[in-house]
């Protein structure tokens, strides 16, 4: 996909450009649904190159899909969710080669109880983890803030911060 800049130069979109374009058009025309046709029958619970025959997720929230996309799911670009989400337009990801498949519905919230405890599994390369272990860390007021302040002071943004009672891990891009 491509467009033109104000000076007339042709500009190709980055990865996810067609997702973002479709989402913006759906919002602009106040569509009832944004159908995104691709080469898979919806959002799968895992990468089929790693897990054999992964199940299609029937319904997922915008937030869940955004997290999974950010962490490596390539079926839909994470930023393309914003235009339709703001307008409450559901997304239906469908398979161009199997139009009879229902695909995956992406909605604001769902009252459906999932068949699974985990929505999906995603992975992304190029991260580094910094592990901090300290006994009684959980009782020290401001400990996490102090750790993050060190990153901020050095101009380093973080991606994810899981923690436990005595541990804190900060994930950052390796570049």
Where are these regions (language model features)?
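C-terminal catalytic "cap/lid" subdomain
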Residues: 1-175
